[in-house]
Each structure stands twice: as structure tokens, then as C-alpha cells.
Amino acid sequence: MKLFGKEQQNSKTMAKERLRLVLVQDRTNVSPELLQNLKEDLIAVITKYMEIDEKALEVNIDSHEDQVALIANIPIKNVKRSVRVQTN
């Protein structure tokens, strides 16, 4: 019985978080597509220097009163010791 209560709490928490994100995105005029593009660009840049868990990466926009912040949670698996220099 406890297991089902825990699952409901998790889905409730996740739904609440999704709603909060939708409201923040609406207030800041940030489309889900823009946020997804930003996430992809961050992955492209960061993977030059670090091995990350792309599936667990979270990028959100948060607002508090009159301030808006970009919040990124990027789990790092490994830091690359050398960086390949790209020449054009």
C-alpha cells in the first residue's frame, strides 16, 4: 500500500513541477522549442570538455519575484584531460 502512495506522491510532484515550468515559460515568453534548442547547444559545448549524462540533464527557467534565472543540472561522468583543438 505504501508503494502506491509513494508513486502517487512522485507523480503528483512531477505534475506540479511540469505546471510550474509551463507557468514560468509562459511568463518569460520562452517556448519549449527554444528551451530544447538551448539544451542541445549546452550539450554540444559541454561534451567538448566533459562526459555528461545527457538523459539526466535538466535545463529550466525559474523566476522569483522580478528575476529570471536559467537553472542547469548537468550530471558529469568524467572530465576530459585533453581537448582537441578545432581548426577551420
Swiss-Prot record:
InterPro entries: MinE, MinE_sf. Pfam families: MinE. The keyword DNA-binding does not apply. Gene3D superfamilies: Cell division topological specificity factor MinE (3.30.1070.10). It comes from the Bacteria. GO terms for biological process: cell division; regulation of division septum assembly. Keywords: Cell cycle, Cell division. Belongs to the MinE family. NCBIfam families: minE, PRK00296.1. Prevents the cell division inhibition by proteins MinC and MinD at internal division sites while permitting inhibition at polar sites. This ensures cell division at the proper site by restricting the formation of a division septum at the midpoint of the long axis of the cell. This is Cell division topological specificity factor. It comes from Carboxydothermus hydrogenoformans (strain ATCC BAA-161 / DSM 6008 / Z-2901).
